[in-house]
């Protein structure tokens, strides 16, 4: 994909910066990470958490959610205008887990949002530091991507559950900005657009008046973001059609679903970033690491190095497997929910099993679960190698694929054949081939059919030893191509419920 002059790297999106050189980007990302770390340390002090309790990922998530809630201006405004019984719009909170007499106990805490905003700003040199907030949102989104399937959401919008590899970032809040848009998969944006079009079909005033004008601007902006993710002219031309439609309706929904399917073979560019839990950054800051001075990158070796020497714990339910819980969090940390399991496994240096074989539920614990029966164990988040995260979809190579997920979205820039069976994907393309976009559809289908394995394997750099910080000696791993590469294969993951 030709990089236009206007493209900002994701680190710039992430830090809201203008064009900067590599050193400045590393410094501003470092400043953002350091701010999250300082905030976390301060919150642990305020909550009087012990060192061990501060390393508990469930406590980290509660603290992260509190700061996101404190800065959610739209929702805060809504809560103040529509007061509900027993909910103080000025307060936020959640479960904090403490170790008391050898048992874990849950304590529900409540905090003034104003107080949390003060702590956050103080940790971020007095600024609002929205980049840090977005970073936390992306970590939560990556955790959801690894934990839940979105079958129901896909079916509701008329898409096929086998397209789950396109759904990265589907739980990101609207307010996640450019950095959020960069990590959203093709399917996620298609789903947002379909929801909009459906509202327009059901509500005559949706596109009308002053509000309608704003809605229209949002619609076109979203179409442009999606267009920017496609790498072929025909897909982009089809997006222009969808964007310019006077009155978007079922024809546009059809076109969008067609485009989403085409992305299983002609993949879109989706950014991947390693976003870690706040407690990891807190631990590093507490041990004297100066992120701003050292610089930091979300797509290089830095997150791997950080995880090599961070000890994070998690509560484990009685019948869960701690190794499986570790795999889940490792995948979330590296945004690898839709990556080929063989690639992830090679980098991690441990076998990575599909979601359906994991004996673990999500990381967060529901309020009705009995915490006293739970133990805590160390999450194994280290890796054998590291690899650069990719922002291109790469291309694809014909391979047997599964009944569950039928394509992958590469996370790591590692050379490999991409697994999926052309027949499975092409079967999705029978049906509607007339209308305004017929010539583009024909062109897209032709490209998909003529895709040859060799043009289509993913050309990446390879993996690197952890001692090879400058990425000088790429190791190109060889994979057993007969194994199953899809994470959501034959799956029984829980559905994501808000």
From Swiss-Prot:
Q: Name one Pfam family in it.
A: Flu_NP
Q: Which HAMAP family match?
A: INFV_NCAP (MF_04070)
Where is this protein chiefly located?
Answer: virion
Main function: Encapsidates the negative strand viral RNA, protecting it from nucleases. The encapsidated genomic RNA is termed the ribonucleoprotein (RNP) and serves as template for transcription and replication. The RNP needs to be localized in the host nucleus to start an infectious cycle, but is too large to diffuse through the nuclear pore complex. NP comprises at least 2 nuclear localization signals that are responsible for the active RNP import into the nucleus through cellular importin alpha/beta pathway.
What's the superkingdom here? Viruses
The molecular function terms of the Gene Ontology recorded here are:
RNA binding; structural molecule activity
User: Any one Gene Ontology biological process term?
Assistant: viral penetration into host nucleus
Which regions are flagged for Basic and acidic residues bias?
8-22
Summary of subunit composition and partner proteins:
Homomultimerizes to form the nucleocapsid. May bind host exportin-1/XPO1. Binds to viral genomic RNA. Protein-RNA contacts are mediated by a combination of electrostatic interactions between positively charged residues and the phosphate backbone and planar interactions between aromatic side chains and bases.
State the family it belongs to: Belongs to the influenza viruses nucleoprotein family.
The UniProt keyword set, sorted, is: Capsid protein, Helical capsid protein, Host nucleus, Host-virus interaction, Ribonucleoprotein, RNA-binding, Viral nucleoprotein, Viral penetration into host nucleus, Virion, Virus entry into host cell
Short sequence motif named Unconventional nuclear localization signal, residue ranges: 1-18
Q: Does the keyword RNA-binding apply?
A: yes
The compartments listed are:
Virion; Host nucleus
Task: Give start-end of the signal peptide.
Answer: none
Query: Under which name does UniProt file this protein?
Result: Nucleoprotein
GO annotation, cellular component aspect: helical viral capsid; host cell; host cell nucleus; ribonucleoprotein complex; viral nucleocapsid
Positions occupied by motif Bipartite nuclear localization signal? 198-216
Post-translational modification summary for this protein:
Late in virus-infected cells, may be cleaved from a 56-kDa protein to a 53-kDa protein by a cellular caspase. This cleavage might be a marker for the onset of apoptosis in infected cells or have a specific function in virus host interaction.
Residue ranges, annotated region (Disordered): 1-22
């Amino acid at each position: 994909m030709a990089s236009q002059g206007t493209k900002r790297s994701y680190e710039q999106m992430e830090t809201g910066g203008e064009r900067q050189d590599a050193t400045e980007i590393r410094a501003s990302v470092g400043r953002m990470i350091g701010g999250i770390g300082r905030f976390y340390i301060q919150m642990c002090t305020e909550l009087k958490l012990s060192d061990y309790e501060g390393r508990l990922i469930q406590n980290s998530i509660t603290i992260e959610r509190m700061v996101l809630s404190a800065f959610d201006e739209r929702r805060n405004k809504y809560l103040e205008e529509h007061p509900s019984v027993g909910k103080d719009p000025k307060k936020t909170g959640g479960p904090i887990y403490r170790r008391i007499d050898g048992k874990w106990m849950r304590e529900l805490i409540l905090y003034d949002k104003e107080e949390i905003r003060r702590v956050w700003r103080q940790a971020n040199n007095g600024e609002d530091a929205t980049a840090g907030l977005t970073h936390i949102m992306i970590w939560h989104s990556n955790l959801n991507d690894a934990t839940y399937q979105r079958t129901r959401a896909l079916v509701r919008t008329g898409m096929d559950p086998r397209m789950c590899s396109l759904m990265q970032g589907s739980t990101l809040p609207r307010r996640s900005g450019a950095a959020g848009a960069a990590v959203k998969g093709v399917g996620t944006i298609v789903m947002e657009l379909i929801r909009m079009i459906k509202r327009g079909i059901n509500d005559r005033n949706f596109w009308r008046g002053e509000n309608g004008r704003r809605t229209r601007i949002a619609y076109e902006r979203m179409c442009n973001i999606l267009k920017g993710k496609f790498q072929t002219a025909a897909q982009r031309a089809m997006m222009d059609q969808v964007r310019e439609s006077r009155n978007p309706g079922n024809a546009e929904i059809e076109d969008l679903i067609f485009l989403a399917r085409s992305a299983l073979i002609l993949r879109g560019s989706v950014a991947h970033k390693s976003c870690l839990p706040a407690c990891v950054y807190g631990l590093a800051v507490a041990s004297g690491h100066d992120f701003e001075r050292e610089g930091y990158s979300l797509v290089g070796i830095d997150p791997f190095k950080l995880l090599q020497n961070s000890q994070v714990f998690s509560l484990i339910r009685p019948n869960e497997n701690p190794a499986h819980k570790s795999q889940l969090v490792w995948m979330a940390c590296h945004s690898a929910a839709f990556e080929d399991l063989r690639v992830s496994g090679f980098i991690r240096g441990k076998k990575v099993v599909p979601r359906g074989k994991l004996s673990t539920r999500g990381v967060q614990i529901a309020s009705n679960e009995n915490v006293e029966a739970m133990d805590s164990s160390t999450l194994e988040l280290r890796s054998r190698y590291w690899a650069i995260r990719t922002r291109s979809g790469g291309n694809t190579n014909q391979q047997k694929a599964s009944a569950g997920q039928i394509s992958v979205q590469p996370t790591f820039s590692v050379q490999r054949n991409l697994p999926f069976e052309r027949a499975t994907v092409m079967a999705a393309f029978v049906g509607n081939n007339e209308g305004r976009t017929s010539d583009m559809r024909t062109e897209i289908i032709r490209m998909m059919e003529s895709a040859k394995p060799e043009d289509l394997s993913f050309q990446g750099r390879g993996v690197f030893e952890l001692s090879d910080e400058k990425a000088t000696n790429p190791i190109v791993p060889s994979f057993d191509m007969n194994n199953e590469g899809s994470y959501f294969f034959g799956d029984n993951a829980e559905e994501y419920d808000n």
